């Protein structure tokens, strides 16, 4: 299962009346451009053989229909299996958002939280013990393999402390 991190990205501009947009810096337009640019982290900065999901799930900005917004707040999540690249993504988001916002006369502020690492059964000895135990209990036909899942699981914390294996039971 993938690592999971969350972030809040705030874009700050300068409000103005809708009849005088040239007097402000539109945070909604800048934030929209940031969303598109962030996807280049997935498609151009990430090794295409490494699964990476960067999702922006909320977008809140503006106060009135006729006012150029001075602030947009967006919340998102990042999922990956690559522990090294995981810790590069925060800076890539910060740099991309700041560079795009600067072009619109706005500023970007990033709050990033590392939640849980990837759950990867990498200890071959423990995997073999679990596999052999499952075969003895349920038979070889019971065992299968799964594709990677971009869901996350805090079991990763236990895996950091003790030799472990993570498995699904049942159908």
What are these regions (language model features)?
Residues 29-171:
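Metal-dependent amide/peptide-bond hydrolase catalytic core
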Residues 1-40, 49:
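Fold-level recognition of mixed alpha/beta catalytic cores in primary-metabolism enzymes, strongest
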């Amino acid at each position: 299962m993938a690592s999971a991190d969350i972030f809040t990205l705030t874009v700050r501009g300068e409000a103005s009346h809708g009849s005088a947009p040239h007097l402000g810096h539109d945070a909604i337009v800048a934030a929209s451009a940031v969303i598109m640019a962030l996807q280049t982290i997935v498609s151009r900065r990430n090794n295409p053989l490494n699964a990476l999901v960067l999702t922006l799930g909320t977008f809140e900005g503006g106060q009135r229909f006729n006012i150029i917004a001075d602030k947009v707040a967006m919340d998102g999540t990042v999922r990956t299996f690559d522990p090294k690249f995981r810790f590069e993504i925060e800076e890539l988001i910060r740099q991309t958002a700041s560079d795009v916002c600067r072009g619109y006369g706005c500023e970007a502020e990033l709050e990033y939280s590392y939640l849980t690492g990837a759950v990867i059964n990498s200890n071959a000895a423990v995997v073999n013990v679990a596999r052999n135990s499952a075969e003895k209990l349920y038979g070889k036909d019971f065992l299968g393999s799964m594709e990677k899942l971009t869901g996350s699981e805090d079991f990763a914390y236990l895996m950091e402390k003790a030799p472990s294996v993570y498995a699904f039971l049942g159908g």
